[in-house]
Amino acid sequence: MPEKLQVAIVGSGNISTDLLYKLQRSEYLEPRWMIGIDPESEGLARARKLGLETSHEGVDWLLAQDDKPDLVFEATSAYVHRAAAPRYEEAGIRAIDLTPAAVGPAVIPPANLREHLDAPNVNMITCGGQATIPIVYAVTRAVTEQGGTVPYAEIVASVSSSSAGPGTRANIDEFTKTTSKGVQTIGGAARGKAIIILNPADPPMIMRDTIFCAIPEDVDRDAIAQSIRDVVAEVQTYVPGYRLLNDPQFDDPSINSGGQAVVTTFVEVEGAGDYLPPYAGNLDIMTAAAAKVGEEIAKESLSLAGGAQA
């Protein structure tokens, strides 16, 4: 059976370049193509130096090749991916979407990756979602196991202004809407809210997030704290710089919390510094999570291919 899935990266910007370095370390993925639209792109130049086939002629060029990728990672824009997605599917190419297009189901690795390993297209939601929804999921999991519910969860993502490009700035409303939806549909809260803060501090600060979850007053708080620690450890397997700033904090019901008990969790995300600076943990967690999803898809695909040949 093939040892690795053949991979194309569509997009040649900062996120794509950082992703390339991560994929080069993979035991299951072989980055072979990088596609862009700017012939002078630094990303394409770096990819060529690393031995990849490159083109500035976009998806048309990629799909015209005799050899086609098994898997595409796309970090372009939502409208570009929406146009390309049906073409990938028609060509039998799986897609991991790092844009807001949301053609396929949103995936948060600790929460729902196993449910979507056979999907033709998966979406990586948002950087804030990748950093905070695992915590909401951890709280909901522990509360649900005790017969309760999480009626409300709110996340506040603070990222360095230096790491927020024009795309992020132009899509703040889309970020909050998409992340809020993920807090509910993937995290498991009945209602969700998301806030993003662009921190102008210089030198730049790493990504820091605050996650508030309303919980039943009589729930086992130790079980919630352990569930959070377990999920943090799982995220750390692909984002080593993801960490709790302190133990989860529990507050009894009050007027300020609408009569609900609350657990508050503080996390920070330091990037690996593969290409993006370490303070850009908000971008690093996107590329690391995408690489994690790709590896799990590859493991599943290669295992099935091996079984069919046996």
UniProtKB/Swiss-Prot annotation:
Gene3D superfamilies: Dihydrodipicolinate Reductase, domain 2, NAD(P)-binding Rossmann-like Domain. One of its GO terms (biological process) is catabolic process. This is Acetaldehyde dehydrogenase 1. GO terms for molecular function: acetaldehyde dehydrogenase (acetylating) activity; NAD binding. CDD domains: ALDH_C. Belongs to the acetaldehyde dehydrogenase family. InterPro entries: Acetaldehyde_dehydrogenase (IPR003361), Acetylaldehyde_DH_C (IPR015426), NAD(P)-bd_dom_sf (IPR036291), Semialdehyde_DH_NAD-bd (IPR000534). It comes from Mycobacterium sp. (strain KMS). The active site is at 127 (acyl-thioester intermediate).
